[in-house]
């Protein structure tokens, strides 16, 4: 999970910012480590390893696969190494084969009782398709992009709920009245909208960009804590108490992804509301998440904006969100 994100970051910086040898060296070192230890031999990617490369957690998490694909896709561009390209393509094929059951045999839910489709995979595929565009057949790429756009903007986007995006629906795309079915994750929804804007730009579809920009504004207004400031982590579309104990925490990545989406929205549409919201989120982010004494940012705040955990090097806290935000800006 984490190593894939870091390999992608250093490869992307080398490809798009500056040909700095130290960035390429870091990317190749990480890529070789992942190639040797990161999967089970069939490109099922472990969630975590110990320091020597022994697996700690089985390859249940589909995002380990997506981040490996992104990593080796960018690394293949940086190095011209065909083996890296083949790893990215093979892993992408495995991801698509897992769409209906991302966790596979590690899925702990009982089948048939309450089967739900989750927003996270279609969301990340919107980004992933463009990340490895250079490796895919054009027809295959086009089909994948259209499928992702449909899932995000026609299945999880719900105009009958005021234009918000829900986190789970049933397998037929219907709303479900349960904790999972009522869940709204503002950070996921807002992050997905800058992926959709990128697709709209790539496909020359200004109406898609406009819809994604407006959805960003809707989700920010919906997810913003009117009392304490900041964006909620989890919400319930009916206003019921969410089941997640951390529902009212303020997370660094949610705010950083929001800044990216707002900047893209303003750049691509010129809508002043994006700029106004950007300044509001920017002020909150730099005031609350930045460590004024030492480098790096805090990741987790309570509802009132106070630091919950001073530890910065958590497995969900890579340099990618912050670095990506700076690059996208």
Q: What is each PLM-predicted segment?
A:
Residues 1-329:
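Glycan-recognition and catalytic cores of secretory/periplasmic carbohydrate-active enzymes
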């Amino acid at each position: 999970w984490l190593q894939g994100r870091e390999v992608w970051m250093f490869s992307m910086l080398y490809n798009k910012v500056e040909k700095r040898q130290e960035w390429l060296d870091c990317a190749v070192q990480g890529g070789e480590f992942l190639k040797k230890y990161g999967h089970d031999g069939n490109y099922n990617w472990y969630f975590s390893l110990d320091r020597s490369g022994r697996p700690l957690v089985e390859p249940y998490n589909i995002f380990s696969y997506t981040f490996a694909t992104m990593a080796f896709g960018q690394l293949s561009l940086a190095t011209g190494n065909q083996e890296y390209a083949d790893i990215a393509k093979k892993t992408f094929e495995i991801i698509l084969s897992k769409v209906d059951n991302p966790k596979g045999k590690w899925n702990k839910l009982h089948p048939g009782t309450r089967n739900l489709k989750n927003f996270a995979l279609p969301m990340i595929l919107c980004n992933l398709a463009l990340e490895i565009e250079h490796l895919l057949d054009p027809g295959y790429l086009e089909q994948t992009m259209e499928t992702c756009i449909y899932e995000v903007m026609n299945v999880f986007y719900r105009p009958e709920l005021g234009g918000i995006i829900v986190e789970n629906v049933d397998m037929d795309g219907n709303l479900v009245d349960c904790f999972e079915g009522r869940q709204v994750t503002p950070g996921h929804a807002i992050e997905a909208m800058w992926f959709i804007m990128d697709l709209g730009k790539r496909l020359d579809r200004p109406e898609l960009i406009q819809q994604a920009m407006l959805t960003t504004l809707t989700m920010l207004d919906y997810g913003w804590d009117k009392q304490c400031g900041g964006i909620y982590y989890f919400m319930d579309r009916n206003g019921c108490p969410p089941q997640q104990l951390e529902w009212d925490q303020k997370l660094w990545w949610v705010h950083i992804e929001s800044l990216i989406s707002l900047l893209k929205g303003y750049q691509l549409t010129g809508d002043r509301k994006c700029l106004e919201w950007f300044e509001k989120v920017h002020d909150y982010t730099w005031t609350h998440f930045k460590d004024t004494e030492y480098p790096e940012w805090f990741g987790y705040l309570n509802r009132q904006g106070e630091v919950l955990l001073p530890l910065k090097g958590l497995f969900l806290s890579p340099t990618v969100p912050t670095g990506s935000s700076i690059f996208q800006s």
